[in-house]
A protein has these predicted regions:
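Alpha/beta enzyme core
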Residues: 1-137, 148-154, 158
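Extended, intrinsically disordered, low-complexity segments
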Residues: 51, 144-181
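Active-site loops and adjacent core secondary-structure elements that bind or stabilize anionic groups
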Residues: 140
Length: 181
């Protein structure tokens, strides 16, 4: 991580987010009880990253996977506190529950000790301002544009196949000029 942070700083990259999953990483939405990194070892990585940064503005965000991996709130808060104490500039917390309650509880119990980043992929029904009021600092709409792109590509592909022509689709897609600008 030291070398990565140094290289990112050399290139004026604003920050990095590292997560407490073990290698090889598996998708957070697959199963529960996934193994997580040892807290002390992960804290050592955070310290190493922060010690090697060459710009004061560089941010290291620690992604806590305890909730989404099924380890529970107590474990999530314990890890977040350890990572924050070790120098993390912010905490990213994630949940696969659809009601947002787990994230709102975390934010309430966390108490704005440092910035918190959330990724509401599964709890999209909860208005963003509810999280802002509870203390979330950053909201990442992680894959909605990708998913919208997939739907649009499917629609255009179906239309081209159905009409056996590009003409009908041309008015619904970006121009070639738009791609290169």
């Amino acid at each position: 991580l030291r070398r990565v942070v140094q290289k990112l700083c050399q290139r004026d990259i604003a920050g990095i987010c590292i997560e407490d999953k073990l290698f090889p990483k598996t998708n957070s939405f697959i199963g529960e009880g996934q193994p997580l990194a040892d807290i002390d070892e992960f804290c050592g990585k955070i310290k190493a990253g922060k010690d090697s940064q060459t710009h004061d503005e560089f941010c290291l965000i620690a992604r806590v996977e305890a909730l989404i991996s099924g380890w529970g709130m107590e474990e999530a808060l314990k890890r977040a506190e350890a990572y924050h104490t070790s120098g993390a500039d912010g905490i990213l917390i994630h949940s696969k529950k659809s009601d947002g309650a787990e994230i709102l509880t975390f934010l309430e119990e966390w108490g704005r000790r440092c910035p918190v980043v959330i990724v509401p992929t599964t709890y999209y029904d909860v208005p963003t301002d509810a999280f802002e009021k509870a203390g979330a600092s950053v909201v990442i709409w992680a894959n909605h544009n990708l998913r919208a792109g997939i739907s649009a590509m499917r629609d255009v592909s179906r239309r081209i196949y159905r009409e056996q022509s590009l003409k009908g689709a041309e008015g619904t897609i970006a121009s070639v000029k738009d791609i290169f600008e």
